[in-house]
Amino acid sequence: IIYFHYVKEYESRSSVKTEGFYTAADKGRYVRNMYNHRAFGTLCNKCVRTELYKKNRIYFPKYSYAEDCYVTTQLAGYASSIERLDEVVYHYRKNNPSSITRQGRKRRKNEYAMNFLDLYEKYRDVPLSENPVAVIFDDILIQAGWYSIAYGLDLYTKYPYLAEGIRKARIRGGSDVWLPMQVLVKLYSLFR
């Protein structure tokens, strides 16, 4: 994988999006940072060798929201080489009124959680040594629990394993879910 910076074009301004520095040696950190929005989980700022898709089973999401991150976390987890091109290469237009990101917040959060719970289901039985996304399992479960509580999504009913998975998950910094909310999610899951 070669990744690079990009420019996000808004209607009246533009913003350079600079990616941090990652290598294959710390791809677990890269995968976790992509999931937790501390690195770009987009495909638009990456070049990926076709061989990475052919050599590994790369799954594609059921829902539209966060589809890039769903794929890039797998690709980065499998990559034997990750290099940064320290240049702006791509321009991303943000002013598309029909964009998926213009959906209502509840719908976006629901699709995000369901996509990544699907990814969790696909990889949960894969041995750690072969698992490209195991590093984000706790984040996936806790975030789904948080979204279920905060947005009234009823994910605990739809995914019966969710409460038990959250009870086993570790509370960690660097997550999109604030530490006190992670504690709340774990407590809530004790009674599910």
Identify the function of each model-found stretch.
Residues 1-83, 92-108:
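Donor-binding/catalytic cores of nucleotide-activated saccharide
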Residues 43, 48, 52, 87, ...:
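Generic alpha-helical secondary structure signal
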Residues 88-96, 102-128, 143, 150-165:
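Catalytic core of nucleotide-sugar-dependent glycosyltransferases
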Residues 118-131, 183-192:
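Long, charge-rich low-complexity segments
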Residues 128-137, 171-178:
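Structural motif
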Residues 135-147:
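Amphipathic alpha-helical repeat scaffolds of TPR domains
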Residues 149-192:
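Membrane-interface aromatic/basic loop that binds lipid-linked glycans or pyrophosphate carriers
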